[in-house]
């Protein structure tokens, strides 16, 4: 990590800010909140914004970015913006149109990072979550290597600066890395990662291949969305985390974010609350000791909040593997 600019270098030479602003919110949250929160995040210093076609807020997020460029707060090149290819567009011929649709919604010329949202391909069409009469997901069958080739073409066309994946296990990453004629390696793998699911083996694997691990749900998951397993314990109430926070006069959330930064993980902080958005920027103002890091490592219990159980049974369901 380059501490001065707080950025990490990708294997393709581009840089990603280590702290990102997450924009996912449950459907009942008005989209206008994404607009206001993203503007505020940029005002207080966030330079990395993470969204996705699935979140259905790219118009608002794009508007926020453009308004902060228009008022002189930032230039386009100061902002690192990530979008994601949703599961119903993994067929190679659907990849570029999906990215172009995101760009159209954003009203931007390019994204900085475009990633495959999940390896679980779903039936193409206008439904994000296509289901049959019995309510089961309708799967599609796609060779992810072919999807990857379509992403490589998007990079060559200048629609995205970098390309990566999300929710891939190490075997799925290996499949891409070992692909004959591979032009570009994935720059990152964005996965759920927090002290209860610290992904140490996947992190080690990614580091050995010069792939950056990006953490979502870094504070656990408070959202009662259809993707969340709600029987899990609340991460931010963990006594060890709370004790370390108290010692440093920080919040448990900041300790959880700082933990990732010190492991070389790029971390997304999702909040639409102005006080917390501002607070999350303080992750660079303190340092955890080696003892703190070891204690937090010891909290791992392989608890997955986003286990995407509807995807079980798909040949590419990623979470049956250990990592």
Swiss-Prot record:
It is found in: Cytoplasm. Its main location: cytoplasm. Substrate binds at residue 117. InterPro entries: AKR, AKR1C, Aldo/ket_reductase_CS, NADP_OxRdtase_dom, NADP_OxRdtase_dom_sf. GO terms for cellular component: cytosol. Pathway: Lipid metabolism; prostaglandin biosynthesis. It holds the Pfam family Aldo_ket_red. Keywords: Cytoplasm, Fatty acid biosynthesis, Fatty acid metabolism, Lipid biosynthesis, Lipid metabolism, NADP, Oxidoreductase, Prostaglandin biosynthesis, Prostaglandin metabolism. Belongs to the aldo/keto reductase family. This is Prostaglandin F synthase 2. It comes from Bos taurus (Bovine). The lineage of its organism: Eukaryota, Metazoa, Chordata, Craniata, Vertebrata.
């Amino acid at each position: 990590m380059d501490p001065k600019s707080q950025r990490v270098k990708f294997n393709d030479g581009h840089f990603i800010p280590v702290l990102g602003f997450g924009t996912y919110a449950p459907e009942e949250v008005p989209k206008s909140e994404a607009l206001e929160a993203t503007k505020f995040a940029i005002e207080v210093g966030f330079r990395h914004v993470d969204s996705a076609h699935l979140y259905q807020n790219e118009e608002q997020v794009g508007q926020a970015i453009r308004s902060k460029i228009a008022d002189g707060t930032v230039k386009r090149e100061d902002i690192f913006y990530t979008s994601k290819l949703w599961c119903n567009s993994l067929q190679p011929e659907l990849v570029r149109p999906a990215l172009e649709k995101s760009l159209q919604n954003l009203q931007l010329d390019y994204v900085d990072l475009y990633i495959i949202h999940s390896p679980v391909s779903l039936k193409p069409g206008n439904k994000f979550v296509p289901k049959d009469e019995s309510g089961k997901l309708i799967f599609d069958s796609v060779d992810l290597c072919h999807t990857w080739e379509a992403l490589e073409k998007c990079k060559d066309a200048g629609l995205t600066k970098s390309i990566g994946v999300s929710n891939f296990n190490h075997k799925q990453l290996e499949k891409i890395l070992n692909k004959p004629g591979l032009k570009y390696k994935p720059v990152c793998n964005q996965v759920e990662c927090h002290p209860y699911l610290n992904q140490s083996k996947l992190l080690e694997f990614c580091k050995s291949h010069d792939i950056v691990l990006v953490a979502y749900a870094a504070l656990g998951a408070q959202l009662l969305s259809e993707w969340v397993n709600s029987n899990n314990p609340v991460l931010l109430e963990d006594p060890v985390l709370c004790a370390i926070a108290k010692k440093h006069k920080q919040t448990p959330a900041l300790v959880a974010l700082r933990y990732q930064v010190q492991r070389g993980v790029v971390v997304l902080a999702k909040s639409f609350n102005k006080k917390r958005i501002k607070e999350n920027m303080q992750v660079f103002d303190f340092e955890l000791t080696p003892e703190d890091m070891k204690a937090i490592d010891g909290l791992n219990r392989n608890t997955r909040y986003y286990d995407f159980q509807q995807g079980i049974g798909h040949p590419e369901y990623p979470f049956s593997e250990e990592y």
